[in-house]
């Protein structure tokens, strides 16, 4: 049977504008140690791997706002986190104003 992965899609307002800028950097130069794939102009796909949640060395490269989203996806047994401009705002997660 093929593997079918769960995706959590949430609003990109759950990360700061600064963090979004880091996600937009070319993978080879990205300061965040994650598998990140752009979703055109609307957001990002992020692989939620066990090592991200469990390894404190990897977590030090991940901004806390993004780590909160990753932990939320992990708690809901998702393999992928999709941060999308039109995604749902989750009351348990902090939101940020990108217009500052």
Model feature map: region roles:
Residues 4, 40, 75-77:
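A short, structural micro-pattern
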């Amino acid at each position: 049977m093929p593997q079918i992965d769960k995706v959590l899609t949430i609003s990109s307002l759950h990360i700061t504008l600064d963090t979004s800028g880091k996600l937009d950097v070319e993978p080879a130069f990205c300061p965040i140690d994650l598998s990140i794939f752009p979703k055109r102009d609307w957001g990002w796909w992020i692989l939620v791997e066990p090592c991200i949640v469990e390894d404190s060395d990897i977590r030090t490269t991940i901004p806390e706002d993004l780590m909160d989203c990753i932990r939320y996806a992990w708690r809901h047994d998702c393999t992928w986190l999709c941060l999308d401009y039109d995604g749902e705002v989750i009351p348990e997660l902090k939101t940020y104003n990108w217009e500052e």
